[in-house]
Amino acid sequence: MHSERAPFFLKLAAWGGVVFLHFPILIIAAYAFNTEDAAFSFPPQGLTLRWFSVAAQRSDILDAVTLSLKVAALATLIALVLGTLAAAALWRRDFFGKNAISLLLLLPIALPGIVTGLALLTAFKTINLEPGFFTIVVGHATFCVVVVFNNVIARFRRTSWSLVEASMDLGANGWQTFRYVVLPNLSSALLAGGMLAFALSFDEIIVTTFTAGHERTLPLWLLNQLGRPRDVPVTNVVALLVMLVTTLPILGAWWLTREGDNGQ
């Protein structure tokens, strides 16, 4: 009789892989509470919240956090608008070049970040646009659009066109149909796509390196701190903050898409 249960060694390998991937993250989280000033003294001498207080009083950290939040919020907003419009334009329409357009929409997230960053920097230099806040937002929006587009187009494909036709047959105009029929079906996909886009933007570093100029987002601040051993405890606190800000939206997006799939 065939058993559907996975072999023990396969389970062991899977859990070993999970531990291998997440152990460094747990180390950073643990040492954010370490009482020692040293980088990674083992075993930890105790627990303290001192470094959280120190980080909260550092103006350079607060400025980096504020900039990252602003960039992520604006890039997510742009991605929601452009990604939704692109998905709506490609939904239920067959025309020459449709597949090519879909490929171009997915290209920014498929290409290596260094290629995207270099291409954006070249484009900005060509039009004499100096790197700064605006260029960071544009750079982040290029790959955030992909996340929103994928979520929305997938939901569009699971939405029955007969619902739209029934709404129009009952006398609803285009706006009413969108407001009361289409948008409720897209709401969880939009929210999940927006949360994923925000998480991707908040911790993006490769594209940001090419487009930031003199600006310093939180990931760039962390990169600059690698050469300062005395600040390692504070750096661990900031790294923990980045992990929380990016992990929570990803978990929320997973939960939303799971609920949406179960409801279809």
Swiss-Prot record:
Bilayer-spanning residue ranges: 13-33, 71-91, 101-121, 129-149, 190-210, 237-257
Ranges per topology, Periplasmic: 34-70, 122-128, 211-236
Residues of the ABC transmembrane type-1 domain: 65-252
A Gene Ontology biological process term: DNA import into cell involved in transformation
Ranges facing Cytoplasmic side: 1-12, 92-100, 150-189, 258-264
An annotated GO cellular component: ATP-binding cassette (ABC) transporter complex, substrate-binding subunit-containing
Alphabetized InterPro entries for the sequence: MetI-like, MetI-like_sf
Recorded topology in the membrane: Multi-pass membrane protein
Phenotype when the gene is knocked out: Natural transformation rate of the mutant is reduced by 3.3-9.5 folds. Mutation does not affect chemical transformation.
Key words, A-Z: Cell inner membrane, Cell membrane, Membrane, Transmembrane, Transmembrane helix, Transport
Domain of life where this protein originates: Bacteria
Places the protein is found: Cell inner membrane
Protein family: Belongs to the binding-protein-dependent transport system permease family. CysTW subfamily.
Function statement: Involved in natural transformation. Probably part of the ABC transporter complex YdcSTUV. Probably responsible for the translocation of the substrate across the membrane. During natural transformation, may serve as the channel for dsDNA uptake.
Listed name of the protein: Inner membrane ABC transporter permease protein YdcV
Organism (species): Escherichia coli (strain K12)
Gene it is expressed from: ydcV
